[in-house]
């Protein structure tokens, strides 16, 4: 109902929407927010749809002052802001950014969202209608405003991470997180450098057991048992969930600098709900100087959002010695 969407958008400063798949239910909301200069935050992890929205609405958003911020949940706040946090520390200590960062999921306890599974299914369906989306999904720089950077380190099969001395497996959220990280870099004038490389994988442990686990994870469908959209875990399960993501910056002298981002609730529900709420509040209350446009979390809110997440959302951002 486009009329009711228009009325809603005209009556608020910021629309916070959790209604996905966004490629099915988001286009009119983004269109109306952009047209009326209303801010917008979502949980989108659908790069094909985001690519379309950027192409269709970015120019007008700059004109109307609408700040559209995609991916304000577990995809991709811990990863986007984790890289941003670490690069700021590297630049402060070494005078230039790290040209390579490895994202490594150390722990992730909790159920995946039924909406995440539905979004993936919708993306697969849209590929049949729009085969040109294959190129978007395969390109790590698909959201980087036409910029094409260096070839990225492969992350699609189990490998041994020699610097961490552990086997790592493909991480099913990497295809969206990596695109968002590269978009952030582009939006910030390539703060991380034009030669920046970034990949994400899931730590499984050392030795033969670690290898077997990594190969198993690489062969499975992590969303096979996800709940239906609108369904989810119990409060106890949400409260007992957590996650821990390590970021490893490889420096020119051969050393590394590590940062960790942790969350105190399950990633798909408990933590994500707090992240998107804090994003909306931050955007409206603390980012009045941010120009209109289509953003990722880091260039939109950066340090301001990190501070809010640590104060009110149960996240931590720390450098590890």
State each model region's role.
Residues 44-66:
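Rossmann-fold NAD(P)-binding glycine/threonine-rich loop
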Residues 21, 30-50:
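ADP-ribose/adenylate-binding Rossmann-like module
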Residues 29-33, 57, 61, 309-310:
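A generic structural signal for well-ordered alpha-helical segments
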Residues 63, 76, 88-321:
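C-terminal catalytic/substrate-binding lobe primarily of soluble NAD(P)-dependent oxidoreductases
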Residues 47-49, 73-80, 111:
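Gly/Ser/Thr-rich loops at beta-strand to alpha-helix junctions
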Residues 1-14, 18-24:
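Conserved Rossmann-fold cofactor-binding substructure of NAD(P)-dependent oxidoreductases
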């Amino acid at each position: 109902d486009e009329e009711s969407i228009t009325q809603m958008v005209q009556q608020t400063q910021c629309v916070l929407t959790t209604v996905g798949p966004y490629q099915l239910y988001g286009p009119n909301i983004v269109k109306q927010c952009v047209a009326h200069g209303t801010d917008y935050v979502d949980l989108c992890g659908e790069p094909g749809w985001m690519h379309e929205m950027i192409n269709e609405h970015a120019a007008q958003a700059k004109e109307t002052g609408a700040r559209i911020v995609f991916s304000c949940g577990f995809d991709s706040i811990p990863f986007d802001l984790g890289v941003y946090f670490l690069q700021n520390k590297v630049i402060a200590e070494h005078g230039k950014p790290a040209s390579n960062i490895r994202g490594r999921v150390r722990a992730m306890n909790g159920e995946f969202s039924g909406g995440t599974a539905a979004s993936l299914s919708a993306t697969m369906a849209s590929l049949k209608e729009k085969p040109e989306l294959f190129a978007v999904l395969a390109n790590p720089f698909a959201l980087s405003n036409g910029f094409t950077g260096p070839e990225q380190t492969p992350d699609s099969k189990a490998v041994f991470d020699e610097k961490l001395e552990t086997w790592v497996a493909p991480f099913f959220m990497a295809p969206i997180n990596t695109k968002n990280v590269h978009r952030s870099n582009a939006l910030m004038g390539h703060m991380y450098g034009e030669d920046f490389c970034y990949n994400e994988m899931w730590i499984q442990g050392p030795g033969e057991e670690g290898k077997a686990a990594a190969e198993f994870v690489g062969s499975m469908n992590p969303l096979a048992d996800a709940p239906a959209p609108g369904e989810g875990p119990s409060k106890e399960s949400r409260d007992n969930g957590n996650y821990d993501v390590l970021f490893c910056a490889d420096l020119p002298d051969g050393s590394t600098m590590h940062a960790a981002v942790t969350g105190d609730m399950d990633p798909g529900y408990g933590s994500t709900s707090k992240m998107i709420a804090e994003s909306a509040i931050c955007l409206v209350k603390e980012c009045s100087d941010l120009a209109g446009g289509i953003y990722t979390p880091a260039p939109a809110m950066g340090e301001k959002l990190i501070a809010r997440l640590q104060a009110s959302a149960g996240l931590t951002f720390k450098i590890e010695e």
